[in-house]
């Protein structure tokens, strides 16, 4: 890995040397920030899987159990690898993740396009399913690499505005689904029967991510090399209390002492976090982190499954809604919520307010919306309302959770900490997606009227348990440590 770091630093130094003659530090920050946002805006192709799955089922006869097997492998690649990716980003810089995204995005999409070209209806062999599964695993890995590289770049450029610095890339990532679903409506990507021409779609994404990967590498490598200048200017040092993680700033003003708390106190760092391995181990020993992980599994799993199986859900809930329209509605509501929650979390929790409100309250509201959204899937006559509720909850969760993690354990550790939490969507998505596929294949061939009611009753219960766990962590652990508002 040292060779990788030397290679990346060499290229980064060349980029920095060239740009230093043309761009000021202030503009360098802005350029890197906007390139990272644009990368997020194009990185959500994996979130269009519900559009891909409809074509795979209708055009090639792949059943929903196999489709959910492929979706589960993409979730494993997307989320289960994030702890390692986050740790690498903290130690070697986010530019390494940009290279990883190029290595896996481009060949995977091109291989998928060739596999699709060789398929015929009801003539799909196991080798084809394995090829799809492996490629979507790597596409998931590449998605996380590109997105996480952009997210960390944004968060580390403007650490004094955690909510917005995190919510803007998260919002752009959500918006990428909306833009992608509209892009897939173009006649170029359609076949004569109205379904997607996956050969053209996969080739398009292969070329797109080659370009975006290179741009993102330039952006993130510049940030890696300029970190010392960017993060140590006088204005930021004056606001160190606001920028520092809770367990640093609060410890200066609190008189309570606890051995467990002391082990968790993060330290401010410039490029590579001080005592990173030791602090990461202490984070893994924190019981509140494990309870927070369990809550994330129980709420994000149903949301991921809902998004991956949206086409099947519309059909089996007797709705006449258009799939592309519902994907757009869900993406739009998710995008608006991500942006709103980022700004609200910064404003409501600000220490400058007379009565600051903890970010956890926003998380509780998001979970309540998600519970209603899951419960209404088989009971509402207007599916657009269901898409809005579930999209809003999904977007809010992916904004508030990382903001809370950055506030509690520190932005300089965010790659490792938030990356570790990303095993939750992998576990949750796999479990709930396989469960959904089994329910549909076994029950919905007989009775379409209520075949999904049992499944969505259980997902609503899962989100309710998640809400209870959040309250326990906040009131039962963090509040006792003195962290009531953050």
Swiss-Prot record:
GO terms for cellular component: fungal-type vacuole membrane. Keywords: Glycoprotein, Membrane, Transmembrane, Transmembrane helix, Transport, Vacuole. It is found in: Vacuole membrane. GO terms for molecular function: transmembrane transporter activity. Glycans are attached at residues 322, 390, 457. It is a multi-pass membrane protein. SUPFAM superfamilies: MFS general substrate transporter. Its main location: membrane. The keyword S-adenosyl-L-methionine does not apply. InterPro entries: MFS (IPR011701), MFS_trans_sf (IPR036259). The keyword Transmembrane applies. Probable transporter. Belongs to the major facilitator superfamily. This is Probable transporter MCH1. It comes from Debaryomyces hansenii (strain ATCC 36239 / CBS 767 / BCRC 21394 / JCM 1990 / NBRC 0083 / IGC 2968).
